[in-house]
Amino acid sequence: MDSSTKTLTEDKQVYRVEGFSCANCAGKFEKNVKELSGVHDAKVNFGASKIDVFGSATVEDLEKAGAFENLKVAPEKARRRVEPVVTEDKNVYRVEGFSCANCAGKFEKNVKQLAGVQDAKVNFGASKIDVYGNASVEELEKAGAFENLKVIPEKLANPSIQAVKEDTKAPKEEKIPFYKKHSTLLFATLLIAFGYLSHFVNGEDNLVTSMLFVSSIVIGGYSLFKVGFQNLIRFDFDMKTLMTVAVIGAAIIGEWAEASIVVILFAISEALERFSMDRARQSIRSLMDIAPKEALVRRNGQEIMIHVDDIAVGDIMIVKPGEKIAMDGIIINGVSAVNQAAITGESVPVAKTVDDEVFAGTLNEEGLLEVKITKYVEDTTISKIIHLVEEAQGERAPAQAFVDKFAKYYTPIIMVIAALVAVVPPLFFGGSWDTWVYQGLAVLVVGCPCALVITTPISIVSAIGNAAKKGVLIKGGVYLEELGAIKAIAFDKTGTLTKGVPVVTDFKVLNDQVEEKELFSIITALEYRSQHPLASAIMKKAEQDNITYSDVRVKDFTSITGRGIQGNIDGTTYYIGSPRLFKELNVSDFSLEFENKVKVLQNQGKTAMIIGTDQTILGVIAVADEVRETSKNVILKLHQLGIKQTIMLTGDNQGTAEAIGAHVGVSDIQSELLPQDKLDYIKKMKAEHGNVAMIGDGVNDAPALAASTVGIAMGGAGTDTAIETADIALMGDDLSKLPFAVRLSRKTLNIIKANITFAIGIKIIALLLVIPGWLTLWIAILSDMGATILVALNSLRLMRVKDK
């Protein structure tokens, strides 16, 4: 890591932002924060309503940067600092009040300009901000004052701030009644109603009528005008600039009623947009409430309720039947069934006993458990999932990058078109100034990019949140999009298509001079001393069948590399190994017929081992890695989804590989591969198919996972490695979640494309009404508002995609 990168990482602070009304506002906020003195960089996460600030900035500075929409900024809640690393100056804050991504961007920009802030990064999806450097909550809230953002500390690394905040719990978010939250909108709407009543009774030109409409415009549009005028002064054009100019123009030509309608409908549109984004974020907030905040802990012989922040590694937690588990740990006493649906998406409770791992947020259904704590609260699996999902929501997907770039040029172009519509017909074609200025104002309103800007953030946040609740951790919008474009999927065999746990499938005694139990006892005594992976299957079989082997004395035990093992028992040397070993021993009864029987077992995907002496064959035992019950159905569903190329990669021999591959139904089989061979094959597949996914355990096939377009790891709930290294993790070690993830990804892509097409299409239709002069401010604002509402509702459908 170079020095500049290290500095940014050290000074990152995260803030929550309240008040974003749209994605465009988040972007504007980010831009403002970046311009703050002392801020090196900032990144807004619109989906999470957060901003990461790299550098020094106060909450006041951040709220000032967000003043255009009265954003409220709050540092994220402080978390336990175990070992200060290069990220020790990164401060995380939750931000309440983000109304749009543009506002989040503006807030990020404002935070970056704060003195003492080296960089900042807003996570709009998680409503958080990372601030790198020193900044107080007041400074951050000042940077977000344009949208009255509230900033709440979540993770503060700066020692001076830490000392003050260490014992401070994150404040509870206040539930503001609807009528209070939207009091100005309701009052302005009431004034419009009275205005139209006066218009009906007293006429359009009556002073009372005009004053009622003017009052409605001023009250309902105060926050709009505050931002709009600031933008005009700075030549910063966004949707609020368009609306401000349109309302001013309508007022100038005397269209008070329509100007007030534009203000009110725009405010309603923003409120609905904010509501939609909050609904999308709720999927992650619900994860935060899964784990209890307190746990019953035994200390010094006493059982006491302790807040999870104060529980240490090594503490003993008592979990009663029907209670949720508060912390990750290992069971030291008790047996129960635990519902892990919150973490893994599994609907069926899992049997748990001593030495089994349990996770925070899961439900203990039956027995009393004593659990030894293995992780601090911020390091639990559910905490990591929440953190990674919030980070994922903050990553800009390719579709979002396109929309952001498009919107940057779109708004100024709309203003130019509106000006041309207002000026050209009267100047060159003898048109009426009043008529065409009115048409130009309508073009400004219809050109508002609300629907375009909001579609991708809501879609990505909804999809990632839904996936997380069903046990699929997707670590970014980019991976969500790429998964939908996958043309081929490579499967590592062991632990993915198979269970990864070998079992004894066949055992046949071929000599009448020895009993079955006696022979298996000899096999077990020899395999007990072996380091071969398949030995565990034999030991497990012996335990299940109550076969004792401790009284069998083995002498001169030797491992025969690549062939098997040997040992002397009561003066006789026994051998266990491959057919090749017994061929080399020239055992007399190793016939062609016997060899064919062994090949039959091998062709069934089993590893056959022979037991005997140098004189005779006593028996044959076969061990196999059991195929998952779901593997065949998963491959079938993937083929039905249009993914024709499903390839199994394995280091097994060709016979075993072909047997398993044929059983599960993959389209291609690659056997006898080393890890490097798997990597090379993935590169070859990418060259041939373009987008390729690789699914494995995330450990021994890490190079191949990294080389694939999308790396998918199994068993994320039990292994930190899988969560941290893969692009997507199947938390419940459940392969059946893969088709769901592909379907969700494709549906997300389709909805984003449909939304963008619809939003642009509705605007083109409305703009065409300019030609005959039919476009009114009513039609303009209703088309924009309607498009925004329909786009938001369509995106929220992703929260309801089921895991079939």
Swiss-Prot record:
Show the GO cellular component annotation of the record. Answer: plasma membrane
Compartments reported by the entry = Cell membrane
Give GO terms for biological process: response to cadmium ion
Question: Which CDD domains does the annotation name?
Answer: HMA (cd00371), P-type_ATPase_Cd-like (cd07545)
Q: Does the keyword Glycoprotein apply?
A: no
Per the record, a Pfam family? HMA
Which Gene Ontology MF annotations are present? ATP binding; ATP hydrolysis activity; metal ion binding; P-type cadmium transporter activity
Q: Which residues form the HMA domain?
A: 11-74, 89-152
Q: Which UniProt keywords apply?
A: ATP-binding, Cadmium, Cadmium resistance, Cell membrane, Ion transport, Magnesium, Membrane, Metal-binding, Nucleotide-binding, Phosphoprotein, Repeat, Translocase, Transmembrane, Transmembrane helix, Transport, Transposable element
Q: Does the keyword Transcription regulation apply?
A: no
Record's InterPro entries?
ATPase_P-typ_cyto_dom_N, ATPase_P-typ_P_site, ATPase_P-typ_TM_dom_sf, ATPase_P-typ_transduc_dom_A_sf, Cation_Transport_ATPase_IB, HAD-like_sf, HAD_sf, Heavy-metal-associated_CS
**Its topology with respect to the membrane?**
Multi-pass membrane protein
Reaction catalysed by this enzyme: Cd(2+)(in) + ATP + H2O = Cd(2+)(out) + ADP + phosphate + H(+)
The entry's family comment says:
Belongs to the cation transport ATPase (P-type) (TC 3.A.3) family. Type IB subfamily.
Q: What is this protein called?
A: Probable cadmium-transporting ATPase
Naturally occurring in which organism (per UniProt):
Staphylococcus aureus
Gene name linked to the record: cadA
